[in-house]
């Protein structure tokens, strides 16, 4: 017999750093999900990833208090900041550029993010990522 789905919860958790403290603990606790069980499973699943990278996770929880979760790739902004060695984006994107990024780096980001983007091909994914780069104040070169 199939489990009754009680709902879904979307969180962004640093890789390998899930703890029962806020915001994770309260979000899971009010839905009756075992917090420590999730933290251990999440940390085990993300141990191969870069520590501290924000990982979007979709938690599906059931009426019997069990859960499953699926991991996504980190946000495009994380990859762009990492590739351009930035702390944050521009306060005035389009007017003030805080750095540059090459099309080769955008291509590598697009390949990494392809499974989470709703693009049909790599060129469309690259255009999406270029738009994100411009909105962060990065100049696309090459």
Curated annotation (Swiss-Prot):
One GO cellular component term noted in the UniProt record for this chain: cytosolic large ribosomal subunit
Q: Which InterPro entries match?
A: Ribosomal_uL11, Ribosomal_uL11_bac-typ, Ribosomal_uL11_C, Ribosomal_uL11_C_sf, Ribosomal_uL11_CS, Ribosomal_uL11_N, Ribosomal_uL11_N_sf
What Pfam families does this protein's entry cite?
Ribosomal_L11, Ribosomal_L11_N
Record PTM text: One or more lysine residues are methylated.
Q: Which UniProt keywords apply?
A: Methylation, Ribonucleoprotein, Ribosomal protein, RNA-binding, rRNA-binding
Q: Per the record's keyword annotation, is rRNA-binding included, yes or no?
A: yes
Q: Name one GO biological process term.
A: translation
Q: Which GO molecular function terms does the record list?
A: large ribosomal subunit rRNA binding; structural constituent of ribosome
Regarding protein family, the annotation reads: Belongs to the universal ribosomal protein uL11 family.
NCBIfam families reported in the protein's UniProt record: L11_bact (TIGR01632)
Q: How does it assemble?
A: Part of the ribosomal stalk of the 50S ribosomal subunit. Interacts with L10 and the large rRNA to form the base of the stalk. L10 forms an elongated spine to which L12 dimers bind in a sequential fashion forming a multimeric L10(L12)X complex.
Q: What does this gene product do?
A: Forms part of the ribosomal stalk which helps the ribosome interact with GTP-bound translation factors.
Q: Specify the protein name.
A: Large ribosomal subunit protein uL11
- From what organism does this protein derive? Bartonella bacilliformis (strain ATCC 35685 / KC583 / Herrer 020/F12,63)
């Amino acid at each position: 017999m199939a489990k009754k789905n009680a709902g879904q919860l979307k969180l962004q958790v640093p890789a390998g750093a899930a703890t029962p403290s806020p915001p994770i603990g309260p979000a899971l606790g009010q839905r009756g999900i075992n917090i420590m069980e999730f933290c251990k499973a999440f940390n085990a699943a993300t141990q191969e990833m870069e520590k501290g990278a924000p990982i979007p996770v979709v938690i599906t929880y059931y009426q019997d208090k069990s859960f499953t979760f699926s991991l996504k790739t980190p946000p495009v902004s994380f990859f762009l900041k990492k590739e351009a060695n930035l702390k944050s984006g521009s306060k005035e994107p389009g007017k003030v550029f805080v750095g540059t990024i090459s099309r080769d780096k955008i291509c590598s980001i697009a390949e990494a993010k392809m499974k989470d983007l709703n693009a049909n091909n790599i060129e469309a994914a690259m255009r999406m990522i270029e738009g994100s780069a411009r909105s962060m104040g990065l100049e696309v070169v090459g």
